[in-house]
Amino acid sequence: MIDRKGFYEMKEYRVGGHEASFLPDGNWKMVWSDEFDGTELDRTKWDYRLSMMGKRHPAWTDKGVRLDGKSNAVFSILLEDGRPVSSQLQTGYNFMDEPVVATKFGHDALQWNIGKLKKDLYTHKFGYYECRCKLQQKPEGWWSAFWVQSPIIGASLDPAETGTELDIMECFHHGVIAGHNAFTGGYGLDSKRASVGGVKDLDMTVFHRFGMKWDETGYTFYIDGKEDGHIDQYISRHPEFILISTEVKGYRYEDHQPVKEAFEIIGKDEFIVDYVRVFDPVKE
């Protein structure tokens, strides 16, 4: 991995009626996007992530996102069954997420320890991935993220074959963007990680652009047109899906209880996403 930072020539890519993208040098074409126009979430593009690692995750709901009619998806915390919850959106599915339903393999009382598989809505390999968003103002109660993940991460020891998790943006603390990660090997004994970059003192009151260029050389990360590091390990050659995440803190701790700060900001904080776009390079 290369911890390089600096301004590089970025190319403006205009999208009619919306904020422009800023892309690395070269020629690009947009191959997928959601501008969040209208007032209803496009369910042909997004589904709600409700389960994780074979269990229904208590932090998530399918009611925590609304479109504001101004081309934004607005994430917020709400109270559900006495618990503060929020939403994650995804364009595909991890094969280990769904809860296991008891069945049999033929006449044998045996089965794989995975739930029902789902067909992905959208996956992609290589290209440039960009999100423009305004971060939550009170991250002491919840966190936000923009990332991609392989549907079959960890199904083999070869990241080229079964993919990685790529964390383009994660915000756990005020003004801080965590280092960008490439995880491989799944989420157990074989898990490995490379990390690079990250910033402090980011202005939380304005929109920012977070991007990643993924190609045969690895992953290059960008914040507001400034390169924030390159990872040349664990290079995936498998199509992956996109996630926009929020999550109340505490549910992943040993007692699986939300932090008290989450209760204090119910209905008082928002994570706002202007757009998500995917670009492919145009071959000369």
Identify the meaning behind each predicted range.
Residues 2-284:
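GH16 jelly-roll
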